Amino acid sequence: MKPLFLLSFAVLFTVGQAQDADPKQRARSVRDLAKQGEDAIPRLAPSLSDPDIGVRVEAVKALVEIGGPKTLDSLVRAAADNDPEIQIRATDGLVNVYLPGYVKTGLSGRLSRVGSTVTSKFTDTNDQAIDPFVQVRPEVIVALGKLARGGASLDARANAARALGVLRGRDAIPDLIEALRSKDDKLMYESLVAVQKIGDPSAAPRISFLLRDLDEKIQVEALETTGLLRNQEAAPQVRDALSHARTIKVRRAALAALGMIADPADHAIFIQNLSEKDDLIRAAAAEGLGRLKNPADRAVVSPMFTNERGMNPRLSAAFALVSLGELNTDRYGPLQYLLNGLNQRSWRGVASPFLIELAREEPIRQSIYAMLGMATKDEKIQLSIVLSRSGDRDSLPALETLSKDPDADVAAEGIRSLRTLRARLP
């Protein structure tokens, strides 16, 4: 009887604190509740409706600190608040449930508030995304979509757009497209990156109006997204952007986009740009030839692979040669050169996407399987990811072997990649 009495007293004491007339005391009570962990989640809910913004902010911070799936309902509710700081913190908290640690690098970690004015600072790093097998609750995507479309501030909207990209929120694409018409560079950029991460080709035609945007950063991102989504219909607009490029960055992005679209009509453009002085222009031209898959172009690309000194264009030439059918696995061949790139942190981000694209073809996967036995630790880890993204049923034995590798890091990635691949397969 005594323990029950003490519990009832504790609950009444907490409720009494929450009803305190002093907002500072109510905020203090919320912070104390957060220390109780998941059990405090239902008791924090009333504070999300507190008339004082400071108390509501503390309630959201407490939910984010507690974390875990049980906070989702309350965080979705908090995302509907009309205060930008609360919206930003709720957004980061929602993402953090699915990508633990996100809140440490999210926008809420760089917020400052003076009265009703909330200032924040976005980082340029935006390369995070959940694993494809992670299932996000629909109401989370709906809540973030509403924020991207009409949050309380442009920062809150941009932060929600970034979150949708991290969570691969396909159902919120209409909200992201609406955000692209905001005329705010930050929001437009984050929305483009999100569309790119989601990777739905049906969204591509709806971003074409940005291919001639006057802001270089927006135009470059629109060109990159158009290429990655393989929007064939936009090829004339991309060619126009290439011929009227105001900067080298726009020119690179336009040629790279044409290289990804891979229209045979652009063959002469690729040949012409193979001899350009700029490394990235030569690289994009080689990639375009690789994707056109004209066997005769091996004679053009092969000398480039042999003689090229720039790392970027040489990796691109290696990609092109493998795409054109050069599948030998010797130590000086193009496929091994791409694998070598996986060992270097500075070039892994170039070599890995090439291999992910190439591994969609079964003959190339067979060559990769043959090379796994002699692969380094980094190569095994990265090739696990490649096969998880582009493999088929024939990749299961290779990933099962990697999941049992003596190296713990290799085995861990093998298990994770095996799970990703199985989730992808019909």
Question: Model-predicted segments: where are they?
Answer:
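Alpha-helix N-cap/helix-start positions at coil->helix boundaries
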Residues: 23-24, 38, 53-54, 69, ...
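Eukaryotic acidic, Ser/Thr-rich intrinsically disordered low-complexity regions
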Residues: 403, 407-426
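Alpha-solenoid repeat junctions
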Residues: 33-37, 63, 67, 94, ...
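Solenoidal tandem-repeat scaffolds enriched in leucines and small polar residues
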Residues: 123, 127, 146, 153-159, ...
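Amphipathic alpha-helical scaffolding segments comprising HEAT/armadillo-like alpha-solenoid repeats
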Residues: 11-17, 37-49, 68-80, 100-119, ...
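N-terminal segments that cap or nucleate solenoid repeat domains
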Residues: 14-58, 62
